[in-house]
Amino acid sequence: MTLTAPRPRVTVAVFPGTWSERDFAHVARAVLGWEARLVWHTETDLVAPDAVILPGGFAHGDHLRTGAIARFSPIMSAVEAFASAGGPVIGSCNGFQILAEAGLLPGALMRNEHLEFRCDWQTLRVESSSSSPAWLGELKDGEVVRLPISHGEGRYVADPATLDELEAAGRVVLRYADADGQVTDDANPNGSDRGIAGIVNERGNVLGLMPHPERASEAEVGGTDGLRLFHSLERWLQARPAVAERRL
């Protein structure tokens, strides 16, 4: 996919203990031909990005709770302002945990139900892709995608009222499922409520998911389903006048 507008520019936040930032940057630069900047968590300037990425890892060693310290990093004020203005933000794994701790997404991520760290390829069913055209516009409801997971605290939980609200608003966008797209207990790797693997905020511009799309963006490493999220972003940005008019 080639943009006629300037290349997308993404900022990847870096916290002490995260490590997926370089995977995201590699995909952005080498696979997609985008610009990617790694910005340390103490900074307050996101450097005029088109999108912001919160990567996976163990920010601050996951002390207290996953993401509990990272949410207070200076960069998060800038991320919150960017998201409030409608800017697209994605948080994968630890990034999802940080988004939840910061209040940008509801609910929390807890220890896996079986108390084991899970690192494997996982099948997921796409739900309500229209709720997030920026991140899921290239995916179709009901289809099954395959992304890797790598977490010990990925069990999504929320109170019943919040879960019902998310469901009713179409904000549950990914569920753990088997290869046939059936959401079952056996297909759920961590015990997440209602098999939830990914959700979006009310505007749909902030996506949190436990799987790692950046690790499924090259055929050589096992699959390219993750690349479709970035293609969705690229197409969405291409349609925005502010991006088309930007001069690098």
Q: Language-model segments: what does each one mean?
A:
Residues 57-58, 95, 152, 213:
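Active-site metal-binding loops of divalent metal-dependent hydrolases
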Residues 8, 142-144, 201-206:
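Beta-strand-turn-beta hairpins that frame and shape the catalytic cleft
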Residues 85-86, 168-170, 202:
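Structured helix-beta-strand junction loops
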Residues 1-92, 100-106, 112-118, 125, ...:
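N-terminal beta1-alpha1 cap of cysteine-dependent amidohydrolase-like domains
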Residues 10-11, 146-150, 207-210:
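Active-site-proximal beta-strand elements of phosphoester/diester hydrolases
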Residues 41, 178, 201:
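Acidic surface patches and DE-rich sequence motifs
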